[in-house]
Curated annotation (Swiss-Prot):
InterPro entries: Acetaldehyde_dehydrogenase (IPR003361), Acetylaldehyde_DH_C (IPR015426), NAD(P)-bd_dom_sf (IPR036291), Semialdehyde_DH_NAD-bd (IPR000534)
UniProt protein name: Acetaldehyde dehydrogenase
Catalytic residues identified in the record: C128 (acyl-thioester intermediate)
Pfam families: AcetDehyd-dimer, Semialdhyde_dh
Keywords: Aromatic hydrocarbons catabolism, NAD, Oxidoreductase
Record-stated family: Belongs to the acetaldehyde dehydrogenase family.
Keyword 4Fe-4S in record: no
Sections of the chain in a coiled coil: none
Annotated NCBIfam families: ac_ald_DH_ac, PRK08300.1
GO MF annotation terms: acetaldehyde dehydrogenase (acetylating) activity; NAD binding
EC assignment: 1.2.1.10
BP-aspect Gene Ontology terms: catabolic process
Length: 308
């Protein structure tokens, strides 16, 4: 039996997520979409697909008769708006999957720590860069400690809508924190690049892990990364390594750490292409977010069904 869900936000991410629920999920049923722009393509598309809509935001959503059938809400708006949305939805007893960088609930990256948070009523999907790179930091950390993790996420400028651009500062802060909290690095840093190239390029991510053990088992690290890539590919088929993992000895002063580090640098180069459900395939940054959110919601619902 499927469980009713709603999407807050009728932009690129919200619309792609709606289509994923409709096309891919056996356990989730798309009930409603709420936005604030009555002329948005997302709301128009939802209406064409037979999904109930409102342009009155979260207030309009909870006022819909169909809201009674909604058990879980995806929030695909902005970090600032989410705090209000969470308060409203929490008061109505709804579970929330947050696709903004607000991080009201715990960070969740499905192949790394989803099992730890299945009882939560609000979970945060970090950022697109976080979903792509935190698994790699965590994979390295399963073999050897990571002192410093730095990621560079390069995304097509055309894939960055108003919501993404409004959240740029929160993107870097939230991703860096997730590198530490979920990835396990002592210190994390995140950089995002909006690539204006036309035709647009696929999402590329570079992950640097600095490890204090120069003699760490390189084969074991490479194998752990390969295993993690396969785990992500279960729900994001377009996620892949672009080349072999690189290893370099380092012995230098790191301003971010405020000290000298002698150890091993592990460099991982990733590419993410989207599934093309609603967004172009170059928007892998958005696709990995919606795919991770869908995977998370299905697991949350399954956990509740087992314990009901």
């Amino acid at each position: 039996m499927s469980v009713g869900v709603a999407v807050l936000g009728s932009g690129n991410i919200g619309t792609d997520l709606m289509i994923k629920v409709l096309r891919l999920s056996d356990s989730l049923r798309m009930v409603a979409m709420a936005g604030i722009d009555p002329d948005s393509d997302g709301l128009a598309r939802a209406r064409r697909l037979g999904v109930t809509t409102t342009a009155e935001g979260v207030a309009g959503l909870v006022a819909l008769p169909e809201f009674a059938d909604v058990a879980l809400v995806f929030d695909a708006t902005s970090a600032g708006a989410h705090r209000h949305h969470d308060a409203v939805l929490r008061a109505h007893g709804r579970t929330v999957v947050d696709l903004t960088p607000a991080a009201v609930g715990p960070y969740v990256v499905p192949p790394v720590n989803l099992d730890e948070h299945l009882r939560e009523t609000n979970v945060n999907m970090v950022t697109c860069g976080g979903q792509a790179t935190v698994p790699i930091v965590a994979a390295v950390g399963r073999v050897t400690p990571v002192t410093y993790g730095e990621i560079v996420a390069s995304i097509a400028a055309k894939s960055a809508g108003p919501g993404t651009r409004a959240n740029i500062d929160e993107f870097t802060e939230t991703t860096a924190r997730a590198i530490e909290v979920v990835g396990g690095a002592e210190l994390g840093k995140a950089i995002i690049v909006l690539n204006p190239a036309d035709p647009p390029l696929l999402m590329r991510d570079t992950v640097y892990c600095l490890c204090p053990d120069t003699d760490a088992d390189r084969s074991a690290i490479a194998a752990a990364i390969a295993d993690m890539v396969r785990a992500v590919q279960e729900y994001v088929p377009g996620y892949c390594l672009k080349q072999d993992v690189q290893f370099d000895r380092v012995d230098s002063y790191l301003p971010a750490l405020g000290r000298r580090l002698t150890g091993l640098q592990v460099s991982t180069f990733l590419e993410v292409s989207g599934a093309g459900h609603y967004l172009p395939t170059y928007a892998g940054n958005l696709d990995i977010m919606t795919s991770a959110a869908l995977r998370t919601a299905e697991r949350l619902i399954a956990r509740r069904a087992v314990t009901a």
